[in-house]
């Protein structure tokens, strides 16, 4: 403080000397300097406490806002880490659901294919059975038709042959032999 007063006094003295004695006298300048110092001293004495309190309040509010900002930053960091963790969990669940959906689709596909194959096998078996039944019917009908035709042809041939006298004689002889054998038997 003393250095400041000395500096101000010297500066004002040199400024007065450089003016060419047209300004204030050094005594007046010193008196004005002392008045200013007294004013500053009174302001310091009476304003020290309120100014100090104002600076302390300002400092405390800055510190408090920094602490609050740091606390909010830490809370935001925690929320961010929780959100990242939830995002990772959601991604894992989505992958699991996708995998499960694919597995379910594959299982359903296999079931549908197996069912279709079973139905196809049953249809083939039924078709074979139907074909066999129809084939047997056709064989029987063909055999009956063949027997009927053979019978008709045989009758026609027999009728033609019976028209011959030699055949009639042989037939009568054979019938007579049969009758004799029956009598004897």
Swiss-Prot record:
Disulfide bonds: none annotated. InterPro entries: ATP_synth_b/b'su_bac/chlpt (IPR002146). It comes from the Bacteria. Coiled coil: none annotated. It is a single-pass membrane protein. The keyword Membrane applies. The chain crosses the membrane at residues 27-47. The keyword Translocase does not apply. One of its GO terms (cellular component) is plasma membrane. Pfam families: ATP-synt_B. GO terms for molecular function: proton-transporting ATP synthase activity, rotational mechanism. It is found in: Cell inner membrane. Its main location: membrane. Keywords: ATP synthesis, Cell inner membrane, Cell membrane, CF(0), Hydrogen ion transport, Ion transport, Membrane, Transmembrane, Transmembrane helix, Transport. F(1)F(0) ATP synthase produces ATP from ADP in the presence of a proton or sodium gradient. F-type ATPases consist of two structural domains, F(1) containing the extramembraneous catalytic core and F(0) containing the membrane proton channel, linked together by a central stalk and a peripheral stalk. During catalysis, ATP synthesis in the catalytic domain of F(1) is coupled via a rotary mechanism of the central stalk subunits to proton translocation. Component of the F(0) channel, it forms part of the peripheral stalk, linking F(1) to F(0). Belongs to the ATPase B chain family. F-type ATPases have 2 components, F(1) - the catalytic core - and F(0) - the membrane proton channel. F(1) has five subunits: alpha(3), beta(3), gamma(1), delta(1), epsilon(1). F(0) has three main subunits: a(1), b(2) and c(10-14). The alpha and beta chains form an alternating ring which encloses part of the gamma chain. F(1) is attached to F(0) by a central stalk formed by the gamma and epsilon chains, while a peripheral stalk is formed by the delta and b chains. PANTHER family: ATP SYNTHASE SUBUNIT B, CHLOROPLASTIC. This is ATP synthase subunit b. The lineage of its organism: Bacteria, Pseudomonadati, Aquificota, Aquificia, Aquificales.
């Amino acid at each position: 403080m003393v250095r400041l007063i000395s500096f101000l006094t010297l500066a004002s003295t040199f400024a007065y000397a450089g003016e060419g004695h047209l300004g204030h006298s050094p005594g007046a300048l010193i008196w004005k300097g002392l008045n200013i110092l007294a004013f500053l001293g009174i302001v310091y004495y009476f304003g020290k406490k309120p100014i100090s309190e104002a600076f302390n309040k300002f400092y405390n509010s800055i510190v408090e806002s920094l602490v609050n900002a740091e606390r909010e930053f830490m809370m935001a960091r925690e929320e961010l880490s929780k959100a990242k963790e939830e995002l990772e969990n959601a991604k894992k669940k989505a992958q699991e659901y996708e995998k499960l959906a694919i597995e379910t689709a594959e299982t359903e596909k296999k079931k549908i294919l197996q069912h279709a194959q079973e139905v196809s096998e049953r249809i083939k078996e039924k078709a074979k059975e139907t074909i066999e039944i129809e084939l047997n019917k056709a064989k029987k009908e063909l055999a009956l038709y063949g027997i009927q035709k053979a019978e008709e042809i045989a009758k026609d041939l027999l009728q033609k042959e019976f028209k011959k006298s030699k055949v009639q004689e042989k037939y009568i002889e054979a019938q007579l032999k049969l009758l004799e054998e029956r009598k004897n038997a």
